A protein has these predicted regions:
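Hydrophobic helix-and-loop "lid/oligomerization" segment in the mid-to-C-terminal part
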Residues: 1-99, 104-137
Length: 137
């Protein structure tokens, strides 16, 4: 019985984490129109949870997204889609345009859009610029 309670608590904690991530995603998602398709762009969701959160977003009728793109600090984009949209083609072409590779499956794919060090440099520039503006210390 003790082991059952332990797994029940783990399941509850996991479901709470997913619910919190879904709420976060709905707050930070940005709309992007791509050739008449509604894309949702999200920054800050760990790769381990992207497929689960994408499914929740893509099949939520109130949100009505056809593609979800997850941007991350490593300079990569992960795409998820529903219906007839082949995001592997998008990832492949986007990766080629920016000089990196990309691809995957019809409904789940990804590509690199910039180097990790380049992304870090840009983030540090934004951080430094912002810190210099507040003049607290």
């Amino acid at each position: 019985e003790e082991i059952f309670n332990y797994f029940f608590l783990l399941d509850e904690a996991y479901n709470l984490k997913i619910d919190n991530l879904f709420d976060f995603a709905k707050r930070v998602i940005s709309d992007f129109d791509y050739k008449g398709y509604k894309l949702g762009v999200i920054y800050g969701i760990d790769g381990d949870y992207q497929s689960i959160i994408a499914d929740k977003i893509l099949f939520d009728k109130k949100l009505d997204y056809e593609v979800v793109a997850f941007l991350n600090v490593y300079g990569t984009v992960s795409f998820r889609s529903k219906n007839d949209i082949d995001v592997s083609d998008i990832a492949k072409k986007l990766g080629m345009i920016v000089g990196y590779s990309g691809g995957g499956h019809k409904h789940a794919s990804g590509c690199r859009i910039c180097d990790r060090d380049e992304m870090k440099k840009k983030m540090m520039e934004i951080f430094e610029h912002s810190m210099n503006k507040i003049k607290i210390l």
